[in-house]
């Protein structure tokens, strides 16, 4: 077979593949996607409610918790410190102005404690004899909810607190201004809630006038805007590499945190190794990690019927 004939055959097969792909793209999506009007209304209602933030937590009642105290002492507990070491005790813990200042061994199990060697008396004391003491848990990926699911932030906060979570990183906690206000109220002990760190998505903010984040300079302007508002860090997806670099450069220069859900829409240009090299601090979910492990950092072999929006 001469070269000319071979080229014609290859071209014919190439065109056939194109027609086949177009044909499949026409007929495949039609199957099984007819929705009733009622179902469409339900979907639109869920979308409408999901776009609205939750109700703010009510002010703390007088019977909800005690303190803070100038000097709080927790006495005689067995501590699990979270480092991987074994439990130990009895231990006295001294907290002054909401800060742990001393963790002191005061004896041995089953042997009377020498009171003269214990920390001095506190304004308020808790007898933790026979109890275990752990540091508060930190949840690095939380959302409060919305008007469709978990519409009351009070419920969410108290659920976290009841499970020992005393610090949270919202990614995002809720709408920007709402989240910053809840962060401030928590810091002032005006509400029953964990300590809150606010991470936000580029372009968010009711008074942001810079438009969509479509170029590196706008990306940097938004980071400076967010920093000024009191945002603690960035919640990213997988923007184009130049924009990702600009966001991370400016965030790191302003001592802000960063976390990314490297969604599959952009993972061909930005896997986890790429993002880490640009200065990303944390990853959430696992998108971008597996692609970084592929030979030559390839992307997954998507099924022909995959639809990212499904």
Regions found by a protein language model. Name each.
Residues 1-16:
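N-terminal secretory signal peptides that target proteins for export/translocation
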Residues 49-72, 79, 83-134:
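Histidine-rich, glycine-flanked metal-binding segment
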Residues 144-146:
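Short active-site segment of divalent metal-dependent hydrolases/proteases
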């Amino acid at each position: 077979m001469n070269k000319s004939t071979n080229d014609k055959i290859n071209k014919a097969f190439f065109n056939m593949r194109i027609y086949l792909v177009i044909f499949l793209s026409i007929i495949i999506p039609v199957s099984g996607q007819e929705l009733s009007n009622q179902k469409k209304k339900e979907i639109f209602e869920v979308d409408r409610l999901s776009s609205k933030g939750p109700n703010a937590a009510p002010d703390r009642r007088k019977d909800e918790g005690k303190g803070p105290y100038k000097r709080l002492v927790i006495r005689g507990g067995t501590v699990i410190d979270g480092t991987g070491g074994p439990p130990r005790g009895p231990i006295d813990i001294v907290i002054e102005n909401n800060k742990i200042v001393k963790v002191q061994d005061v004896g041995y199990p089953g042997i009377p404690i020498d009171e003269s060697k214990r920390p001095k008396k506190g304004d308020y004391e808790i007898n933790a004899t026979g109890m275990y003491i752990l540091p508060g848990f930190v949840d690095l990926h939380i959302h409060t909810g919305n008007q469709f699911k978990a519409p009351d932030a009070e419920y969410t906060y108290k659920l976290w607190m009841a499970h020992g979570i005393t610090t949270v990183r919202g990614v995002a906690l809720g709408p920007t201004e709402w989240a910053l206000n809840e962060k401030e109220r928590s810091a002032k002990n005006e509400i029953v809630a964990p300590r809150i760190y606010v991470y936000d998505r580029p372009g968010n903010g009711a008074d942001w006038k810079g438009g969509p984040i479509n170029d590196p300079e706008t990306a940097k302007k938004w980071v400076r805007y967010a920093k000024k508002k009191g945002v603690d860090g960035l919640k990213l997806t997988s923007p184009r590499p130049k924009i990702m670099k600009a966001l991370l450069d400016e965030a790191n220069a302003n001592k802000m945190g960063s976390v990314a859900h490297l969604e599959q829409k952009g993972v061909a240009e930005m896997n986890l190794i790429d993002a880490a090299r640009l200065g990303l601090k944390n990853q959430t979910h696992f998108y971008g990690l597996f692609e970084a492990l592929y030979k030559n950092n390839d992307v997954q072999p998507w099924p022909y019927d995959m639809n990212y929006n499904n």
